[in-house]
């Protein structure tokens, strides 16, 4: 029988795989551009939450897990386990997408200055993570949590995708970057932006003392 830690790790691997597979596929092949990407990520994160959220919490995102540590819902040891699972799921999803569909190996340069991308990622991730921290403890929302999180993610991608790419997720940026030449050179921008936004969201949530009932 699988231990709780293994079950949680597998759930995060599976959920992150679904999210990155759907989002990366839409980004590479969908004709509708940003709208298709937003819907792919938003709908998939909602499905993932309903599918395995009861096992691991349905993070699928190291930034979300980082915020959960700050809020006291996850230990640092659990955080490390979650992140390994999330990065593994993202990398495997990228492997599948690139093997099946193929893609250019040339990385597109940042469309704007790095600090602009970081600023957008901080703000977008802040809103996303704060929403998750809040709704995940609102018992009256019940089964609507997945829909709210998915809708929020889709809306934020539409809002910032044209500027920063709207990653909001270090794992989501990591997987595809492994298979695109020179893309890892810009990875730090997304890691810094998303983790900073998540940390600020968690600190704000704790400072405000948002009620859990």
Name these PLM-found stretches.
Residues 1-213:
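Membrane-interface helix-loop junctions and terminal tails of multi-pass membrane proteins
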């Amino acid at each position: 029988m699988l231990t709780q830690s293994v079950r949680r790790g597998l759930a995060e691997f599976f959920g992150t795989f679904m999210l990155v597979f759907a989002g990366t596929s839409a980004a590479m092949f969908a004709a509708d551009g940003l709208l298709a990407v937003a819907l792919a990520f938003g709908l998939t994160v909602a499905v993932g939450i309903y599918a395995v959220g009861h096992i691991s919490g349905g993070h699928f995102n190291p930034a979300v897990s980082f915020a959960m540590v700050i809020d006291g819902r996850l230990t640092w040891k659990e955080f490390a386990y979650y992140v390994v699972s999330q990065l593994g799921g993202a990398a495997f999803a990228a492997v599948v997408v690139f093997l099946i569909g193929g893609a250019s190996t040339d990385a597109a340069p940042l469309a704007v200055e790095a600090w602009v991308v970081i600023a957008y990622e901080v703000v977008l991730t802040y809103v996303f993570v704060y929403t998750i921290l809040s709704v995940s403890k609102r018992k009256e929302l019940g089964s609507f949590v997945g829909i709210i999180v998915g809708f929020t993610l889709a809306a934020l991608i539409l809002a910032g995708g044209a500027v920063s790419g709207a990653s909001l997720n270090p794992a989501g940026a990591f997987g595809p970057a492994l298979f695109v030449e020179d893309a890892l050179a810009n990875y730090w921008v997304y890691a810094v932006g998303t983790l900073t936004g998540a940390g600020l969201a968690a600190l704000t949530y704790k400072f405000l003392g948002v009620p859990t009932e």
